[in-house]
């Protein structure tokens, strides 16, 4: 009996490991039914346990909006303030699986003031579900979330036209919304894959089970589409990208370079190039925490041992021997600003790029994007939740790809010099291939260095708040 249980468990584990993972997010206007949709997916795929259902029934009586029925939106509206207001504030993540696939869902806020939260959720997703209220049609928030999804590199959009039960399942309404969105989508990226599904998240129609109330719709259910869609990886399987995250030297006999293989393949005996030093070497070993490998694939966490003794630092890149990738010191980026302190030309920040922290200087704000109309607006600053395009200088040449070519090596986060708080997320549009000395603000550099000295060695002085006010003045 025990042997059979072990065999069955091993088979189950093997099956789980072979399943592909799809990460998607839900977004749209407030009260379009994002949280209800996720709750319905989890409920109808039997992912909610009995004890969770018990507490869900109890919470539905206190906070729910469905009378005596279970309010499935409460499955993901976890914060007390969310349940009281009936809205989503933070990004809520949920995990579930079916017999065909594993899923990670990000339920993102619909309010404009939570644009930064939505951008955070979209940054790691492969697909976006845009909820549209069939009674209201497309809204400004629908346009904004469509644009942010594509800005963050998402190529697959499902336009879920929800609450069809409230418009008597009329095909004409569905077709009009579909037509309007297709016209709008011409302003977005050219290589989008868009599918339209009429549904009712509240009643569970066309979510997991096909409804008979919309015979004019001949397509598949939402779950069926999610289970079968094949996401084309925008990362080239040929272009090797291995940024060094850690120098692994447990003893004098071993020196390895640890990190995640972001793209391409690596094998023992392969000749590689190390950037930015532009030095060639050969892979002698590839090891993990428990074994040695002959080759490594995208996404694997590995430690690489080289044949030659080379001075390699955190943030250096291993690339193909024939790679044309070169260090650059200037770039144009799209940025989502995430703090109350406004972004101005001339400011300096730390950025984290492929595991490497480096100083950048904001040379110029090219424009701000009105995400509701997609118009470029001339601006000298960016405020909280603004999206714009800026030109930046790095303090020294660094390695990166364009975000459209490789999301992993083309993204960066901006970090405040004084508080170490993440203040922005950047997506590299292109390199300007210029090298030079970074313009500096000597007074501000001195103040930030002085601030670091005080909080590290003299925290009892209680000076940081005074300094911060002075710097931000």
Swiss-Prot record:
| Enzyme Commission identifier(s) | 2.7.7.4
Kindly list the positions annotated as binding GTP.
Answer: 28-35, 107-111, 162-165
Sequence segments annotated as region (G2): 86-90
Q: Which residues form the tr-type G domain?
A: 19-238
| Annotated InterPro entries | CysN_GTP-bd (IPR041757), CysN_II (IPR044138), CysN_NoDQ_III (IPR044139), G_TR_CS (IPR031157), GTP-eEF1A_C (IPR054696), P-loop_NTPase (IPR027417), Small_GTP-bd (IPR005225), SO4_adenylTrfase_lsu (IPR011779)
Q: Which GO terms describe its molecular function?
A: ATP binding; GTP binding; GTPase activity; sulfate adenylyltransferase (ATP) activity
What are its GO biological-process terms? hydrogen sulfide biosynthetic process; sulfate assimilation
UniProtKB keywords = ATP-binding, GTP-binding, Nucleotide-binding, Nucleotidyltransferase, Transferase
Gene3D superfamilies named in the record: P-loop containing nucleotide triphosphate hydrolases, Translation factors
The record's listing under Pfam families reads:
GTP-eEF1A_C, GTP_EFTU
Region spans: G5: 200-202
Reaction equation(s) it catalyzes:
sulfate + ATP + H(+) = adenosine 5'-phosphosulfate + diphosphate
* Residue ranges of the region described as G1: 28-35
| Stretches the record annotates as G3 | 107-110
Pathway assigned in UniProt:
Sulfur metabolism; hydrogen sulfide biosynthesis; sulfite from sulfate: step 1/3
Which EC class is the enzyme in? transferase
Q: Where is this region: G4?
A: 162-165
Write out the coiled-coil annotation as residue ranges: none
| Function noted in UniProt | With CysD forms the ATP sulfurylase (ATPS) that catalyzes the adenylation of sulfate producing adenosine 5'-phosphosulfate (APS) and diphosphate, the first enzymatic step in sulfur assimilation pathway. APS synthesis involves the formation of a high-energy phosphoric-sulfuric acid anhydride bond driven by GTP hydrolysis by CysN coupled to ATP hydrolysis by CysD.
Q: How does it assemble?
A: Heterodimer composed of CysD, the smaller subunit, and CysN.
> What family name appears in the similarity comment?
Belongs to the TRAFAC class translation factor GTPase superfamily. Classic translation factor GTPase family. CysN/NodQ subfamily.
Q: What is this protein called?
A: Sulfate adenylyltransferase subunit 1
- Which organism does this record belong to? Buchnera aphidicola subsp. Acyrthosiphon pisum (strain Tuc7)
